[in-house]
Curated annotation (Swiss-Prot):
Gene name for this UniProt entry: GTDC1
Origin species: Bos taurus
Family affiliation: Belongs to the glycosyltransferase group 1 family. Glycosyltransferase 4 subfamily.
Superkingdom of this protein's organism: Eukaryota
BP terms from Gene Ontology: regulation of translation; tRNA modification
Protein name in the entry: tRNA-queuosine alpha-mannosyltransferase
An example Gene Ontology CC term for this record: cytoplasm
Residues spanning the signal sequence: none
Amino acid sequence: MSILILEAFYGGSHKQLVDLLQEELEDSVLYTLPAKKWHWRARTSALYFSQNIPTSEHYRILFASSVLNLTELAALRPDLGKLKKILYFHENQLVYPVKKCQERDFQYGYNQILSCLVADVVVFNSVFNMESFLTSIGKFMKLIPDHRPKDLESIIRPKCQVIYFPIRFPDVSRFMPKHKAAHLQKILSLKENGGNAPSTALPFQQQLRGSENLLKSFDSKSGPCDAAQQESLGCSVRQASYLKTFNSSDDSSTHHGEHKQNRCDVLAEADDQQRPLHIVWPHRWLEAVYCGCYPLCPKDLVYPEIFPAEYLYSTPEQLSKRLQNFCKRPDITRKHLYKGEMAPFSWAALHGKFRSLLTAEPREDL
């Protein structure tokens, strides 16, 4: 086996990616740790892997997510340190998830910076993820009281590239209206390249109450917006409710807290696809849109990179107005055909980039 794949947090999108790579790429072997207690995975997984990965003269490439402290592993296992080392960022600890510096554990972000210095190639799942990480390095290192290292961004940036998270879209046409199923086939067969991006958190705590009250009033009385119309509010209102729950949760898994089930599988089972969408991982939104959801996203973070302008809002007031309009006019979302692109995010479009990435250059010292 020439490709060594390591995943220190084997769950959610981390699991989804490495399972796909191992299935599609011959000559690979996968070592993992369960997706729990991520803090401890980030701190100690390198030592565990160093003791449990057998030595092999056939390894040529090491692929790992940024949960792993690649620096420690390379030091503990010099044989692995000689491989072509690829580090994949699902999220970065310089901007996600904690916003306040005093609440952030310096070590996690510092370890990711060190891992980038050791890696041969650093891959991010979006331009936003890459730029937010690279441009935060300087400010982050100023937290060191004195004798600060310099020029880290300029050292790391040349190694960096963006390869979007690859989605293997299943056939969900039997769950969808015919006009949407036909449109789905059309947009998936279009050109297969990807897109560009910006930063901050979602603001809609206040407007959330108004949206929930709106739904309650529709429950309590009949009128121009009946139960069927409530359905078309679907993802957006429930997304807001989910975010409130997500933001208040203190479960230790929230750093990597995606639903473990593939969003396509979940939504395919749901009538009108009324499921909460995740705030951080853009591929979860794309999976939902693929299943017929109307995306309504903040004009911030990674979303402008993925979705056309008509699906973005800038203020809580705009969000509230859009939701109320959807409630009064449910046909807008029912009949809507997504105007963005899906093909650039499919495995069919991205497999060539991953195959090229996971091709070893000859190394004399192996």
